[in-house]
């Protein structure tokens, strides 16, 4: 007979994963990557340390997922703002201004996401979102060049 997870078990497993990710984000916000330990994450999530490793093979994998979740949220906010702006110039200004304001509200987390030294897996996730944000900015600059909001000065050559 094949084991089949009940809806209740599936819900509990998903809840545990969310609790782990939320706890990790909270602790990284307080102390960065280097100061955050898996045992502390587990305790904050109300789980055993070993349970964390059922969901994530390593601390670096967990942190890469935290970085990806937070970065995706920030990228979505910037994209929504840019898309809702009346023109590319306003979109670029408002998106960057919002990004900076949000980063300043949680400087420790922003430093971890943007610049804190980290493991290769975390840095790979970081680069994915740097490219996505630069792509959004380039889209706005290109649109602004087409509509005359920005001068054409070979911005692409710098990227």
Language model features: what each stretch is:
Residues 111-115, 145-159:
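Hydrophobic/aromatic-rich alpha-helical bundle segments in the mid-to-C-terminal region
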Residues 13-24, 41, 62, 66-70, ...:
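Generic hydrophobic, amphipathic alpha-helix propensity
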Residues 23-27, 98, 102, 136:
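Short amphipathic alpha-helical elements of helix-turn-helix/winged-helix folds
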Residues 72-75, 102-105, 121-147, 157-158:
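Amphipathic alpha-helical packing segments from all-alpha helical-bundle domains
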Residues 65, 76-105, 156-159:
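Hydrophobic alpha-helical connector segments
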Residues 1-15:
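N-terminal intrinsically disordered/low-complexity leader segments
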Residues 19, 27-61, 65:
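Helix-turn-helix
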Residues 80, 113-121:
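Short linear capping/connector segments at secondary-structure termini
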